[in-house]
């Protein structure tokens, strides 16, 4: 009988509960099989026009991914490759999508907003 190695990709958010005073992110945690697509959602503070996505791998500092001003993506230089994309179509809620997840995508994904 052969053995197979099943790799899981673990994605997570901190502070995902919406308190009315902060950014809301969902899902709170996401565990998926390698090769699956994942969409992470960020609902910024009401009235904030700028939105930022970051990721933080275990034992590492935060790494910038992308930045929006209203719905316009101003800087996507931190998106690691073409499997990562982000959108903010109406200048409010943003979605970060990771296609065909890989083990190296395991990290804490965070968003932040500002005026």
Swiss-Prot record:
One of its GO terms (biological process) is cell surface receptor signaling pathway. It is found in: Cell membrane. Residues 1-21 form the signal peptide. GO terms for cellular component: plasma membrane; T cell receptor complex. SUPFAM superfamilies: Immunoglobulin. InterPro entries: Ig-like_dom, Ig-like_dom_sf, Ig-like_fold, Ig_V-set, TCR_beta_variable. Keywords: Adaptive immunity, Cell membrane, Disulfide bond, Immunity, Immunoglobulin domain, Membrane, Receptor, Signal, T cell receptor. The keyword Metal-binding does not apply. Residues 22-115 form the Ig-like domain. Coiled coil: none annotated. Disulfide bonds join 42-111. V region of the variable domain of T cell receptor (TR) beta chain that participates in the antigen recognition. Alpha-beta T cell receptors are antigen specific receptors which are essential to the immune response and are present on the cell surface of T lymphocytes. Recognize peptide-major histocompatibility (MH) (pMH) complexes that are displayed by antigen presenting cells (APC), a prerequisite for efficient T cell adaptive immunity against pathogens. Alpha-beta TR is a heterodimer composed of an alpha and beta chain; disulfide-linked. The alpha-beta TR is associated with the transmembrane signaling CD3 coreceptor proteins to form the TR-CD3 (TcR or TCR). The assembly of alpha-beta TR heterodimers with CD3 occurs in the endoplasmic reticulum where a single alpha-beta TR heterodimer associates with one CD3D-CD3E heterodimer, one CD3G-CD3E heterodimer and one CD247 homodimer forming a stable octameric structure. CD3D-CD3E and CD3G-CD3E heterodimers preferentially associate with TR alpha and TR beta chains, respectively. This is T cell receptor beta variable 7-6. It comes from Homo sapiens (Human).
């Amino acid at each position: 009988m052969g053995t197979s190695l099943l790799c899981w990709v673990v994605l997570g958010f901190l502070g995902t509960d919406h308190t009315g005073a902060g950014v809301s992110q969902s899902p709170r945690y996401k565990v998926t099989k390698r090769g699956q697509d994942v969409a992470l959602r960020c609902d910024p503070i009401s009235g904030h026009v700028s939105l930022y996505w970051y990721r933080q791998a275990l034992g590492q500092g935060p790494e910038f991914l992308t930045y929006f001003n209203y719905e316009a993506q101003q800087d996507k230089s931190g998106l690691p490759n073409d499997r990562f994309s982000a959108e903010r179509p109406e200048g409010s809620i943003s979605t970060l999508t990771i296609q065909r997840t890989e083990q190296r995508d395991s990290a804490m994904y965070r968003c932040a907003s500002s005026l």
